[in-house]
């Protein structure tokens, strides 16, 4: 199956711009991280071995689509497989005029995240504790998901839902292989990070945008 795949190299300037977004929202993001780490001692929302510094990098990673202008098409987004609220919570903090639904089928995680977003005052977000296959996805809602699904699994769960854009945080090689072996034609753009040798966190990573 031949797929329409556009490759886009993302330069270091994009990372620098994303870090500026982080800095503008640092107070609220740090409050979110405080609560995430507090809850993580009770429920495994993120790896217990992860440092706060690495979590901050995960937040920056979550904000990259904003710097690339990929969120502008929709005012409503659902973060599926959200876990502890990544990428949805940071995106909600940095985009107060947009609505974010944090979705995961693990109910105890969503109870924790619901408490986090309430205590953090992230008023433009809410949790949805069910499989994405059971969500009543409204037209005009984009989908984001960070290292939670393979392409075929997510599209199978979405079924006939009226999605238009999906943004997936993926390893570049893995994403290209998933696209190559998928048995239906996809319109995809793969954003490959080229941030330099001194940014090892981002090595081999990228964003896959699927549109229809």
Segments from the language model and where they lie:
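A short, conserved alpha-helix within the catalytic core of class I
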Residues: 150-160
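Conserved beta-strand signature within the Rossmann-like core of class I S-adenosyl-L-methionine
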Residues: 163-176
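Short SAM/SAH-binding signature in class I
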Residues: 140-147
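Active-site capping/gating segments
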Residues: 173-212
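Conserved SAM/SAH cofactor-binding pocket of Class I
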Residues: 60-139
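Class I SAM-dependent transferase core
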Residues: 2-72, 108-123
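Short beta->alpha connector loops
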Residues: 147-151, 172-174
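Residue-level signal for inorganic ion chemistry
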Residues: 36, 170, 210
């Amino acid at each position: 199956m031949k797929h329409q795949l556009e490759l886009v190299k993302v330069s270091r300037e994009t990372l620098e711009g994303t870090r500026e977004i982080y800095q503008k929202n640092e107070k609220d993001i740090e409050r979110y991280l405080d609560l995430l780490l507090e809850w993580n001692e009770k429920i495994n929302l993120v790896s217990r071995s992860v440092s706060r510094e690495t979590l901050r990098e995960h937040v920056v990673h979550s904000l990259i689509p904003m710097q690339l202008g990929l969120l502008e098409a929709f005012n409503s987004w659902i973060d599926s497989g959200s876990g502890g609220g990544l990428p949805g919570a940071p995106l909600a903090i940095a985009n107060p005029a947009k609505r974010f639904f944090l979705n995961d089928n693990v109910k105890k995680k969503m109870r924790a995240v619901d408490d986090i977003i309430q205590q953090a005052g992230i008023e433009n977000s809410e949790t949805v504790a069910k499989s994405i296959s059971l969500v009543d996805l409204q037209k005009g809602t984009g989908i984001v998901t960070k290292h939670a699904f393979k392409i075929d699994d997510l599209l199978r769960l979405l079924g006939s839902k009226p999605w238009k854009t999906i943004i997936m945080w993926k390893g570049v090689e893995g994403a290209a292989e998933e696209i190559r072996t998928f048995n239906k034609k996809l319109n995809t753009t793969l954003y490959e990070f080229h941030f330099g040798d001194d940014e090892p966190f981002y090595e081999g990573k990228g964003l896959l945008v699927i549109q229809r």
